[in-house]
Amino acid sequence: MLKESTYQTPCGTIHYWSNNLSLDTTTLVFLPGLTADHRLFDKQVEYFDGKYNIIVWDAPAHASSWPFRFDFDLFDKAKWLNGILEKEEIIKPIIIGQSMGGYVGQAYAQLYPDRLAGFISIDSAPLQRNYVTAVEIWLLKKMEPVYAHYPWKLLLKSGTEGVATSEYGRNLMKEMMLVYDGDQHRYAQIAGHGFRILAEAMEKDLPYEIKCPSLLICGTKDHAGSCIRYNRE
């Protein structure tokens, strides 16, 4: 059974869930993707609970980690994650990041290269600058108005059907999106800000070297962005 806790930052309060079994047990840190929340990993948490230490969060400004000022970048998220790990006395975790969560994991590896026991990327892509074009970076910075003006019902439909093939997966994504029902402005802010800080992290042109054992997972039916192409390269 996971316990809900909070972590204070200058921009707001982060909510996270953990089951710290013992300091000698391996810790799995689950990081959901952009606009998703901790429920994304419900099935994985259910499977691994009791076998590993587990930490999963609602990312800054997402779901219960609100209100939150959009005055942070990808590296701030990685630093706050490290603060949570230090608070829970966790050393050498395995980070498991889906999409945006995978980018947070890479930023963490850049800042703390010797603190990871492993890194698993799920439908994410490399942060290295050479993988993206200047046009792609420019587009990433311009996404907020798209999400703000896209009809909500169509966004809900494309957002659920485009990210999963199973009924469970689509229903779960719909539930997570419905957190923002009636507040599309907040949803657009989260998405727009997320893409923007992703572009800025790429522009830093850092090595983003993963020094620990790593596993790249990309679904054969994943058509989000250029994920398959990036991982193949």
What are these regions (language model features)?
Residues G97, G101, G105:
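Gly/Ala-rich beta-loop-alpha elbow adjacent to hydrolase catalytic centers
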Residues C11, I55-G97:
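Active-site loop/oxyanion-hole signature of alpha/beta-hydrolase fold enzymes
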Residues G12-P67:
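Conserved HGGG/HGGXW glycine-rich cap/lid loop of the alpha/beta-hydrolase fold
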Residues G192-R232:
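Conserved serine/cysteine hydrolase catalytic core
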Residues Q110, A117-H149:
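Flexible "cap/lid" loop of the alpha/beta hydrolase fold
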Residues M1-T13:
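N-terminal cap/lid segment of alpha/beta-hydrolase-fold proteins
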Residues N130-V132, Y150-E209:
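Conserved alpha/beta-hydrolase catalytic His-Asp/Glu region
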Residues K43, A107-L111:
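Active-site signature of alpha/beta-hydrolase-fold catalytic machinery across serine-
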